[in-house]
Amino acid sequence: MDNKIVENIIPSQPPIESQSDAHVLKSRLEWGEPALTILDVRDRQVHNQGHITGAMPMPLNELVDRATATIAKSRDIYVYGSNDEETAQAAQLLRNAGFEHVSELRGGLAAWKAIGGATEGVVEAKVPPSAG
């Protein structure tokens, strides 16, 4: 059997874009075994109040050092901050540090919540499930 036929049958994720909307990230997470990392570069206290489920807190001032120590440079990374400007700054810092696949999550946590993305945190835990 021709290997090209097999390659065309087995679906694969498209390459990561430099900017993504919340739907793209949600689709990746629903894919099954996503080989990706979500970084929340907001202040840790804000992160603890509520964040995308599974997002790692890495405040902007610690971002490069912590990411370099814990994440492979080839891993797909989705990053979000308090606003799109902070997100873009964080993404550029990561790219400058040698991370190859970094995507800015446009709209951040608000966009994620708007599409019903899963969240966790102190404030999130206080909201009854029926309140959504």
Model-derived segments and spans:
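Short, hinge-like loop/turn segments at secondary-structure boundaries
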Residues: 56, 74, 119-123
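Short loop/helix-cap segments at secondary-structure boundaries that form the rim of catalytic
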Residues: 47-53, 112
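Mobile, glycine- and charge-enriched loop segments
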Residues: 29-30, 36, 61-79
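Catalytic cysteine-centered active loop of the rhodanese-like fold, especially the PTP/DSP P-loop
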Residues: 68-113
